[in-house]
Amino acid sequence: VDEPIPVTRTVDHGTAKLMPDVDRERAWLLTVDAAPQSYVDLDEPTHLEFEYARRLGHVLDTVVEPGRPLDVLHLGGGALTLPRYVAATRPGSRQDVVEVDLGLLDLVREHLPVPEDAGITLHGADARGWLESAAPASADIVIADVFGGARVPAHLTSTAYARAAARVLREDGVYLANLADAAPFAFLRSQLATFATVFEELSLIAEPGVLRGRRFGNAVLVASHRPLDTAVLARRTAADAFPARVESGAALREFIGSAAPVRDEDAVPSPEPPGGAFSIG
């Protein structure tokens, strides 16, 4: 059998590279400008390699009863790791993936195709523009994993954006976002304050070392109108190979502190990761 070889291509927003994993036969790492974007195992779509993807997976597994199909809107495509995961764990789900980088979409379609019958539809569009024109109450889950380079774009951080996401969700729907920050957490705290203006229930999933300010890292924001079973989620995330905590309620309000919600005119991207925090090959 031919050894898989790396693929490098200039896409709309940088240089994308697909690198085969030497340890797993049909698994690939996608980087854009050396920042890891996605890891996907074509033979085992339920395998989630990255810490933040595993945490998003735990939420997806616990938010409604296992196996029930969901309508999911993914903002940010990457190599479609989470759409493949949902298709495998919740067959019959209808999923839309919105990715602004058309070149990246083409690369993934060509080298890491999704089965025709997986119920996954790809759209080349800006995430916020798509949200603002989408049908109201059309999604059970919205997952935002959008990084321009290694930063969350400013226009996806404001109260207007949070309202747009809430409008697309059904009443019992759940919004999830992959964010990144370091102490003193100005960005993360402002994001929590922003989503608190729209959603009654908030949780944050992060590694204790990140929350204690030891290093830069990812945090998953979970927002909904209905209370979620954070105890089940906390057990799942604590038992993971990369243990994490679930903060909610009073502890989370204390973490938010005096942070103010973000208005469109004041919005800034998430902070630049320190050199080497996310870079690879």
Enumerate the predicted regions with their spans.
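Charged, long alpha-helical assembly modules
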Residues: L179-A183, F199, P208, R212-F216, ...
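Conserved class I S-adenosyl-L-methionine
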Residues: P153, L179-T194
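SAM/dcSAM-binding transferase cores
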Residues: V1-P20, Q37-D43, T62, R212-G281
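Conserved Class I S-adenosyl-L-methionine
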Residues: A162-R163, F187-P208
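The AdoMet/dcAdoMet-binding core of the Class I SAM-like
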Residues: R9, R24, D43-R167, L211-R214
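A short, structured beta-strand/loop element
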Residues: R24-V40
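Conserved beta-strand signature within the Rossmann-like core of class I S-adenosyl-L-methionine
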Residues: D172-L179
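A generic structural signal for alpha->beta connector loops
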Residues: G92-R94, D117-G119, D172, F199-E201, ...
